[in-house]
């Protein structure tokens, strides 16, 4: 249940591949150490959104088996991956998953980030004024060190699940 999608890049196809801090993508230990060391830009993580009709079955976990694709007609990039769900996860049956697509967007320094929503064919439009961005937002920061392992706290919440923080812009 601990799949993670992390980003590294290189100036050469042959490498070396590094993260934003210059850490190498290659791990030399018995177990990959991206999680412990926090290497690589984490594009997705286990998350449970607040509000709406979401139930525990909607807690997204274990995003992985991904591909990045570039659409030739306009150069837009997309992340295609699978995700599993906390309440549908069991050690004996790990085949219940859904395929998802998110657009990849560049930051000002050229790194890619995944849009926070599934791609449904729409095109994002940049805001033109402060009125375009006022309101309440739920923001999830993808903790570099968390992962879903199926364990629950005494209150029923899952260990390793990122929760949103609410921000209001006036």
Model-derived regions: residue spans:
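Carbohydrate-active catalytic/glycan-binding domains of CAZyme proteins
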Residues: 1-170
């Amino acid at each position: 249940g601990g799949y993670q999608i992390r980003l590294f890049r290189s100036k050469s196809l042959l490498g070396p591949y590094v993260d934003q801090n210059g850490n190498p993508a290659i791990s030399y230990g018995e177990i990959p150490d991206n999680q412990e060391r926090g290497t690589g830009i984490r594009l997705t993580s286990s998350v449970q959104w607040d509000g709406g009709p979401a139930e525990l079955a909607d807690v997204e976990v274990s995003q992985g088996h991904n591909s990045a694709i570039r659409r030739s007609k306009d150069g837009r990039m997309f992340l295609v991956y699978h995700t599993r769900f906390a309440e549908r996860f069991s050690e004996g049956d790990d085949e219940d998953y859904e395929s998802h697509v998110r657009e990849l967007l560049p930051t000002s320094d050229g790194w890619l980030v995944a849009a926070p929503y599934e791609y449904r064919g729409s095109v994002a439009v940049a805001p033109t004024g402060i009125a375009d961005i006022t309101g309440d937002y739920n923001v999830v920061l993808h903790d570099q060190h968390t992962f879903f392992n199926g364990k629950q706290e005494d209150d029923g919440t899952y260990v390793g699940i990122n929760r949103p923080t609410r921000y209001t812009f006036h």
